[in-house]
Amino acid sequence: MSSGIRTDLALESRELNPDIEGVEEQTEERERMTVSRIKITDRTAAKKLDKPIGKYVTLDAPELCNRPLDLFEQMSAALSEELRDMFTGLKDDATVLVVGLGNRSITSDSLGPRVAERIYVTRHVTEYMPDALPGTVRSVCSVAPGVLGVTGIETMEIVRGVKEYAKPDMIIAIDALASRRAARINTTIQLTDTGISPGSGIGNNRKGLNSEVFGVPVIAIGVPLVVHAATITQEVISLIADKTGLHGDEEKLKRLAEQVISENLGQMVVTPKDIDSIVEDMSGIIATGINMALFGKSYEDVRMLIA
């Protein structure tokens, strides 16, 4: 990495290290979004990119910041499509556990819990009233385990307990992420088959939620909702350099800015003032995409289910 500023996005890690071998890339340009697929194939690349071996898909739609409702539908449909591609071998009657990571009381960290409460849960029906269902329906349950500072219990301990009781065939985890670019807030969704570490968005890594730990496939979905203060400063320096044409000391100034901010403000992270509406929008997009993927429903049908 060229900077000490961390990113949770594999796409950004790759942008910083474009020449590393052991990485397969594919970019698909759609009408209003870009779909980037990255596959890290060996340990050397994983170490250099600071990301586990596996698949990473990024949906990027800059227009989302304007909140166009028709683009919400397109993003949900695209997310659903990519999720189904990761449902390899998942049976129609499988049990799926959706885990909403984060702190419901802190808006910028509440994405996971807000998605979890919008999931169309069916496990109780398949368990106790199966005749009430029209044919084969996946058994879906969701949980928002909270955070260590509120519950006093490691998030993964709670999830492990739920997993042992519900016995899911797959886990889908949702969490807020951190980006190196402020412009990615509210415009980007990443999904990966490598799992996630709660708190990774602010560098507060807890025990990981992944297939190695839980013994079942774990898909993680995240949205950048915070950026480091040093990131914004560096972006401003780049903009000034572009406007003035003075690029000579740009990298030196960026490193100095990062050092000054770190010494005086610590690892400060910031989020937009309209984060409430951003989280509301993104949680709806993600929950709808998950429900569409799990139940094979249309966008309109799913929106009625979770309204």
Where are the predicted features?
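N-terminal amphipathic/basic leader segments beginning at the initiator methionine
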Residues: M1-I53
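An N-terminal, well-structured beta->alpha segment
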Residues: T44-D92
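Short glycine-rich or small-residue beta-strand-to-loop segments that form or flank ligand, phosphate
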Residues: T58-P62, T95-I106, C141-G146
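Gly/Ser/Thr-rich loops at beta-strand to alpha-helix junctions
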Residues: L101-D109, G149, A176-R180
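Glycine-rich phosphate/diphosphate-binding loop of Rossmann-like nucleotide-binding domains
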Residues: N103-R138, S142
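A structural-propensity feature for long, helix-poor, extended segments
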Residues: L133-K163
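A structural signal for small-residue-enriched, beta-sheet-centric alpha/beta enzyme cores
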Residues: V143-A144, A173-A307
